[in-house]
Amino acid sequence: MSSLQPTLTNERIGVLDVLRGMAIFGILFVNLAHFSYPDMYLSMLGKENFFMDKWSEADFAAADILKFFIQTKCILLFSFLFGFGMVVMMERAENKGKRFVPLYVRRLMALLLFGTIHAFLIWDGDILTEYALLGFVLLLFRKAKPKTLLIWAVSLYLLFSIPFMLTSFDQSNGQEWVQAVTQQAKQAIHVYGSGSLKDIAEQRIHDRLVYMSSNGMLTYNPLNYFFASIPYFSMFLLGAAAAKSRYLHEPEKHRKGLKRLWMAGLVIGIGAQVLYSVTDKEICLLIGAPFLMFFYVTTVVYLYHKTRVRTVLQSFSAVGRMAFTNYLMQSIVCTWIFYHYGLGLYGKVYPAAGVLITIAVCAVQMVFSHLWLRVFRMGPFEWLWRSATYLSWQPIAKKTKV
């Protein structure tokens, strides 16, 4: 019996790497706001705040475009692919006669360690820790049938959405609160833009703890945290359902279902996003984001199986194969660009310029990923992660042909 090893190139589902590469780039377009200015605090203040007063029309246009097409959609896509990946890994382990649960627990523990280091030592906006913690809950659903996973996913998502349907969530606050949050934002601009390494480290930890408080991590009530994370977890379940249904393995056998999903994504996704742009109601985003995400997925799946277009889409494949490395490198590069220990541009770059910086970083990552994978089988952080998962150092260099 052959030993269980990480998925190799010839065993991969090509369109997944393309989708993963697109998702990791889309996430950077959204995350750049948090890299370059105190977006977490400014979002609490709403549209009327001291920082947005400096924006030009181009900045507002750039922010609106990102909000319409990318915000929330790409992180939901990445969550969908996470759930999909668990099933692929489980099926492969079972085919090799290996126990899956211990393997996946080690994988999640390693991810949790990486995420914690990332969150407190590099960038406070880390999502890896949440994925790792939710991954343990996902394990409970590993044997569920696709229909069961679908029912759970939809039910949980509706449970999360109901409060937004029943109330307008008036976020008006007293003047003292506004002044306190404004001061927090100004402090972040000062520290990240001109502070010492010690100051930046303390600010990063402070901001991370604020974030963890806002999403329920620090309430010491797992239910509070899980409720705040339902959108991600629902996509985990949908991804697992799609993998078990073989929707992306064998798309030609699911043409009708994929076409219906494409139409629903187009009509409902675009329609809800238009309403969100006009009304700014969160419920419209909650409806529109997953549908628009599935519109993107089905469009890419369809185009990927068109020979001429596949060549273009495959340019994202190397990025997707190194998604873990690229995600972490985005944090390392962008904090260097914006924090004082690097170029010190924090608080000086607005959305329009931020889009250009994002495009430049993505272009460099695409070239780097292609060059790296010419020599190596996987990215450097993928190598560390998989070595921890399989409890042995994995071969990383490609075998040279004699």
Curated annotation (Swiss-Prot):
**Main localisation:** membrane
According to the UniProt record, one GO cellular component term is: plasma membrane
What's in the keyword line of the UniProt record? Cell membrane, Membrane, Transmembrane, Transmembrane helix, Transport
Membrane topology category: Multi-pass membrane protein
Q: Where in the cell is it found?
A: Cell membrane
Q: Which InterPro entries match?
A: Bact_Transport_Assoc (IPR052529), DUF418 (IPR007349)
- Show the stretches that span the lipid bilayer: 13-33, 68-88, 108-128, 149-169, 223-243, 261-281, 283-303, 327-347, 353-373
Q: Which residues form the signal peptide?
A: none
Q: Please name one Pfam family that this protein belongs to.
A: DUF418
Q: What is the protein's known function? A: Involved in transport.
Q: What is this protein called?
A: Uncharacterized protein YxaH
- Coding gene? yxaH
